[in-house]
Amino acid sequence: MALILDGKSLSKKIREEIKKEVENFTSKGFRPPALAVILVGNDPASEIYVNNKRKACEKVGIKSLFYHLPQDVSEEKLLGLIYELNMNEEVDGILVQLPLPKHIDQTRVILSISPEKDVDGFHPENMGKLVAQIEDGFIPCTPLGIDILLKHYGIDVKGKDVTIVGAGFIVGRPLSLLMLWRNATVSVCHIHTKDVKKFTKEADILISATGVPHLIKEDMIKEGAVVVDVGISRLNGKIVGDVDFERVKEKASAITPVPGGVGPMTVTALLLNTLKSYKRKFAHLISTTNP
């Protein structure tokens, strides 16, 4: 039976530490960290994700500023709001919930967010820092959450064969860069990969981020592999991941559940990035208040 990589319990522990750190700053007269969250439209899944992020902020003492714009909002109006938030010294992070409606240029929106407030880590400046392995950038939240989860359970990716199924902008691509930074040997499978099973069978660590329910079967992994499931879907009324959990857990050495694995770690990584931005802004003042 595989070790369950419990992202929910680890997230709870990290969030308690974040809360204490925020309380330490506010007790010295500093304002709390602030995250601005922008939601365009009424996509049910996006609304759930945004609510989860806002609740997580409030529980650790991070101020959540919520901007809910209509589905038909103009791109210029959205960019105008982002400009105002960029200029607001009391905002530490800006998050625009993706995906956006088709009439809005997602790339233009991402580029409009100040890199210093891009706590999602999608701005080319932060992606470039990930490529260059520069510590002071923001790492995208799901890859960062996975990295923290693996480290917590003592799973070292150095020298290991890591296969990532899914080459998306939000998870697959930045995760491949982060795994390279951690000195793994990385393979990335995508829609044009001819034989996905060939790569997954060789993986010491298999990470799937496709959103295709139960894509990863028991016969696609090798004995003793570590399996990380990023996907979240509904199948027959139940929430499931990319991995056929019940069967794969009998063959894997460690596995993340869905829900309760990567999801909570993604939100926790967002909180960590927001705190990082806040501390950077007040670094010179914080150091002078410490004995």
From Swiss-Prot:
Catalytic activity: (6R)-5,10-methylene-5,6,7,8-tetrahydrofolate + NADP(+) = (6R)-5,10-methenyltetrahydrofolate + NADPH; (6R)-5,10-methenyltetrahydrofolate + H2O = (6R)-10-formyltetrahydrofolate + H(+)
Cited SUPFAM superfamilies: Aminoacid dehydrogenase-like, N-terminal domain, NAD(P)-binding Rossmann-fold domains
Disulfide bond residue pairs: none
Alphabetized Pfam families for the sequence: THF_DHG_CYH, THF_DHG_CYH_C
GO molecular function: methenyltetrahydrofolate cyclohydrolase activity; methylenetetrahydrofolate dehydrogenase (NADP+) activity
GO cellular component: cytosol
Entry binding sites for NADP(+): G166, A167, G168, I191, I232
InterPro entries assigned: Aminoacid_DH-like_N_sf, NAD(P)-bd_dom_sf, THF_DH/CycHdrlase, THF_DH/CycHdrlase_cat_dom, THF_DH/CycHdrlase_CS, THF_DH/CycHdrlase_NAD-bd_dom
Record EC number: 1.5.1.5, 3.5.4.9
Pathway where this protein functions: One-carbon metabolism; tetrahydrofolate interconversion
A GO BP entry: L-histidine biosynthetic process
Superkingdom of origin: Bacteria
Keyword vocabulary terms for this entry: Amino-acid biosynthesis, Histidine biosynthesis, Hydrolase, Methionine biosynthesis, Multifunctional enzyme, NADP, One-carbon metabolism, Oxidoreductase, Purine biosynthesis
Primary role: Catalyzes the oxidation of 5,10-methylenetetrahydrofolate to 5,10-methenyltetrahydrofolate and then the hydrolysis of 5,10-methenyltetrahydrofolate to 10-formyltetrahydrofolate.
Subunit structure of this chain's protein: Homodimer.
Family listed: Belongs to the tetrahydrofolate dehydrogenase/cyclohydrolase family.
Name of the molecule in the record: Bifunctional protein FolD
Organism: Aquifex aeolicus (strain VF5)
Lineage: Bacteria, Pseudomonadati, Aquificota, Aquificia, Aquificales
